[in-house]
Regions:
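Residue-level signature of transmembrane alpha-helical entry/exit and packing/kink sites
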Residues: 2-10, 75, 79, 103, ...
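Hydrophobic alpha-helical transmembrane segments
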Residues: 21-32, 50-58, 106-115, 158-159, ...
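Interhelical loop and helix-boundary elements at the membrane-water interface
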Residues: 31, 35, 63-75, 123-137, ...
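Alpha-helical transmembrane segments
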Residues: 4-22, 174-183, 189, 193-264
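Structural signature of transmembrane alpha-helix termini at the membrane-water interface
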Residues: 23, 27, 84-95, 105, ...
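Short microdomains enriched in Cys/His and/or Lys/Arg
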Residues: 58-97, 103
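Functional transmembrane core segments of multi-pass inner-membrane proteins
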Residues: 98-102, 113-217, 258-264
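Membrane-proximal soluble regions of multi-pass membrane proteins
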Residues: 20-74, 238
Length: 264
């Protein structure tokens, strides 16, 4: 993959990230996704040169050109993160190019939809400590239809694949209901349900394990340094860790089965 293509994919990802920021900030606010972007502080309509992903934020030094209020650091972070996600997904799926360009584009767009949803869900969970049902349902539906797709074309899924989401989510559903959502929110359970279909049962288990491991390390670091007012009673959004675990498993193709095989 040439440097020009890599640059194009990253720029494409930052543009996607700019749109995802709009979705995150306007969701459940009564504002539609149409219409021009505006400063969330003074309401000033933004011009094209103020909407260039990453660069506009840097050039304006993180402030609105009109009212000088600080812009959320979320803007450049999500734009950059989306750029890397698009690039990494394309590189992960690039071997398929030797088989079929059409199949590559289909799977790439499919993966892009799925991980864009996960990114929106993750940031929304960080901001509001809740996962909207509509977003988790959309992710579950996209993930479910993935079991009917393969490199060679449409396939008939096995019984295990048909119920992989159910099998993966069931223990956590019992944990959530049994603890009255104190140990795990049911929104996380619905997200795990979709992950089971996107990755399959074995890889899905690995993604959830990674989420718990990464989440534990982050929580311990925050607790140790008392960052952001973090303490033992602080509610930790779990969707970002589930999304990160899912992304790592997707691009590395690791699973519980492959992990166990290393020691057998």
């Amino acid at each position: 993959m040439s440097y020009l293509v890599i640059a194009f994919l990253f720029i494409l990802g930052t543009l996607l990230g700019s749109f995802l920021n709009v979705v995150i900030l306007r969701y459940h606010t009564g504002m539609g996704l149409g219409g021009r972007s505006m400063c969330m502080s003074c309401g000033k309509k933004l011009h094209a040169h103020e909407l260039i992903p990453l660069f506009s934020y840097l050039i304006q030094r993180g402030k609105c050109r009109s009212c000088k209020s600080s812009l959320s650091i979320q803007y450049p972070i999500i734009e950059a993160l989306s750029g890397f996600v698009v690039l990494i997904l394309a590189l992960t799926l690039s071997p398929i190019l030797g088989y079929s360009m059409a199949v590559f584009i289909t799977l790439f767009v499919y993966a892009l939809f799925a991980f864009s949803l996960l990114l929106v869900i993750s940031v929304y969970d960080i901001r509001h400590k809740v996962i909207p049902n509509a977003l988790s349902l959309a992710f579950a539906l996209i993930s479910f239809f993935s079991i009917f797709i393969s490199i060679s074309g449409p396939v008939v899924p096995s019984v295990l694949e048909l119920f992989s989401g159910v099998f993966l989510a069931l223990p956590f559903a019992l944990l959530s209901l049994g603890s009255k959502e104190r140990l795990m929110g049911f929104g996380d359970v619905k997200l795990i349900f979709g992950i089971g279909y996107l990755l399959g049962l074995s890889s899905g288990i690995m993604a959830v394990l990674l989420a718990f491991w990464i989440g534990t390390v982050v929580a311990l670091v925050l607790l140790l340094f008392r960052k952001f007012g973090f303490n033992l009673k602080t509610e930790v959004p779990f969707a970002p860790f589930l999304s990160l675990g899912t992304f790592i498993v997707f691009v590395t193709n690791i699973s519980v089965a492959s992990y166990i095989a290393l020691f057998v």
